[in-house]
Swiss-Prot record:
EC number(s) stated in the UniProt entry for this protein: 4.6.1.12
Pfam families with a match to the protein in the record: YgbB (PF02542)
Gene name of this polypeptide: ispF
Broadest EC class assigned to this enzyme: lyase
CDD domains membership: MECDP_synthase
InterPro entries (UniProt xref): MECDP_synthase (IPR003526), MECDP_synthase_CS (IPR020555), MECDP_synthase_sf (IPR036571)
GO molecular function: 2-C-methyl-D-erythritol 2,4-cyclodiphosphate synthase activity; metal ion binding
Complexes and interactors: Homotrimer.
Described function: Involved in the biosynthesis of isopentenyl diphosphate (IPP) and dimethylallyl diphosphate (DMAPP), two major building blocks of isoprenoid compounds. Catalyzes the conversion of 4-diphosphocytidyl-2-C-methyl-D-erythritol 2-phosphate (CDP-ME2P) to 2-C-methyl-D-erythritol 2,4-cyclodiphosphate (ME-CPP) with a corresponding release of cytidine 5-monophosphate (CMP).
Name this protein carries in UniProt: 2-C-methyl-D-erythritol 2,4-cyclodiphosphate synthase
Binding site for a divalent metal cation: 9, 11, 43
Cofactor: a divalent metal cation
Catalytic reaction(s) noted: 4-CDP-2-C-methyl-D-erythritol 2-phosphate = 2-C-methyl-D-erythritol 2,4-cyclic diphosphate + CMP
Key words of the record: Isoprene biosynthesis, Lyase, Metal-binding
Length: 158
């Protein structure tokens, strides 16, 4: 049996940098406003995994109303959810992440993001794809007000 999950997340720029995305700290004059570390890529990926196992969303498992998760490392949240995936008898087939941002430039950091995600999801890096695009200066991402990310995962029954 296979399961597909989709995730989406958005965070607004604010405060001091760096931007944490895909498990990588990217130098930038602003950070992202969030209850946790604001890693939109890992939040979307975490939601995709939760969706694939029909387990709700990241806010249900790590609510921003709980101080326990304040400043949380999103890599730890991702690993926790992947443990739940494995407990249900699934393993990752592949993950595909799309980052929508006018700034900062993501291209120099994509390989490091793929490596971090592959490590956290206990898979070969060839099963992880991260790509970035701009919105041609349209919308809130185009105005450099924030970053949006989508993620899709394919899970296989072990």
């Amino acid at each position: 049996m296979i399961r597909i999950g989709h995730g989406f997340d958005v965070h607004k720029f604010g405060g001091e940098g760096p931007v944490i995305i895909g498990g990588v700290a990217i130098p930038y004059e602003q950070g992202l406003i969030a209850h946790s570390d604001g890693d939109v890529a890992l939040h979307a990926l975490t939601d995709a995994l939760l969706g694939a196992i029909a387990a709700g969303d990241i806010g249900r498992h790590f609510p921003d109303t709980d101080d326990k998760w304040k400043g949380a490392d999103s890599r730890e949240l991702l690993k926790d959810v992947y443990r739940r995936v494995k407990e249900q008898g699934y393993r990752l087939g592949n993950a595909d992440v799309t980052i929508m941002a006018q700034a900062p430039k993501m291209a120099p950091h994509i390989d490091a993001m793929c490596a971090a995600i592959a490590e956290d999801l206990e898979t070969d890096i060839s099963n992880i794809n991260v790509k970035a695009t701009t919105t041609e200066r349209l919308g809130f991402t185009g105005r450099k007000e924030g970053i949006a990310t989508e993620a899709v995962v394919l899970l296989f029954k072990q």
